[in-house]
Amino acid sequence: MSEQNNNEMAFQIQRIYTKDVSFEAPNAPKFFQQEWQPEIKLDLDTASSQLAEDTYEVVLRVTVTATLGEDTAFLCEVQQAGIFTISGIDGTQMAHCFGAYCPNILFPYARECITSQVSRGTFPQLNLAPVNFDALFMNYLQQQADGAGSQPAQEA
């Protein structure tokens, strides 16, 4: 019974913080006088590292690029990070925690930071929809399974 208690899954948020923020409006004020119908591109990436036994940093990088025609109106990148205590899981469950569960926690903070930066750049309000990191993680696993025997690993 005591072995079972030692192997129970534990998850705790230690800290959530903004690691890096960048906002660029390379063609301002050109776009302030045009009709605002940009193409918005959203890029997401995650990284994790072990800080101590059962303590991990997970970083969610969110990049939003708004373009009108060929020109970039703005580019905003936020690295939202968290320090988490995670124990009692491994393998695919740990990968899911790093690739989906923690990013689901971090994304609302990153979204708020991006919205604030875009507003400070005096661009119209940007509302980013929630992201289903669980579905993205499942797609990633499926791609890994599909390509495991037929292709060498590719850099993202």
Curated annotation (Swiss-Prot):
GO terms for cellular component: cytoplasm. Coiled coil: none annotated. GO terms for molecular function: unfolded protein binding. It is found in: Cytoplasm. Keywords: Chaperone, Cytoplasm, Protein transport, Translocation, Transport. Disulfide bonds: none annotated. One of its GO terms (biological process) is protein tetramerization. Homotetramer, a dimer of dimers. One homotetramer interacts with 1 SecA dimer. One of the proteins required for the normal export of preproteins out of the cell cytoplasm. It is a molecular chaperone that binds to a subset of precursor proteins, maintaining them in a translocation-competent state. It also specifically binds to its receptor SecA. This is Protein-export protein SecB. It comes from Sodalis glossinidius (strain morsitans). The gene is secB.
